[in-house]
């Protein structure tokens, strides 16, 4: 990996990326309301479970296959798989989340003219567009390798979940850093598992997350949009 490619992935994983990630907790706030999270240890366990039991089986392998589709510019496969991922979201909040963040990242890619004209046209045709599809596009535009792309995506997810826990539990900054450090090896394992997952084995089944997300829609007091 070149330094330029590394910097591009750091950019995509940055919390400063203007796609609204800070406004979503992906069920963490509902888990807190259900008393599944109540301190630093339970927050770490929740985030670790989401990484190894949900992301590693669904979003990460999906991202890897979308990256390959963008590299080959297989527009029909991109459209079909993107539509499948959007349909796989188990609540209206989770669907709006991936659509809003995907749209924001796609608009950023277009504004910065990342990728060639033909691929940008395909990107614009994907409506609605899921976040992993847009992330894969941005990564492909910078010629980044799949393992590094998945690691950047997973780290960004862990960091955002930790930031949500800091606000909602609440936790101190040091507790948050301990969570991130504790999950380094889990990120590596999740990436390796995702890279070994064939396209027909991608699995987004997460009933507890779906139920909590649906409950969050009517939760009395909320900081986050999911």
Swiss-Prot record:
Pfam family of the protein (one): UreF
Compartment list: Cytoplasm
MF GO annotations: nickel cation binding
The entry's keywords: Chaperone, Cytoplasm, Nickel insertion
Transmembrane portions of the chain: none
Record's GO cellular component terms: cytoplasm
Quaternary structure and partners: UreD, UreF and UreG form a complex that acts as a GTP-hydrolysis-dependent molecular chaperone, activating the urease apoprotein by helping to assemble the nickel containing metallocenter of UreC. The UreE protein probably delivers the nickel.
Matching HAMAP family: UreF (MF_01385)
Family from the record: Belongs to the UreF family.
Function according to Swiss-Prot or TrEMBL: Required for maturation of urease via the functional incorporation of the urease nickel metallocenter.
Protein name according to UniProt: Urease accessory protein UreF
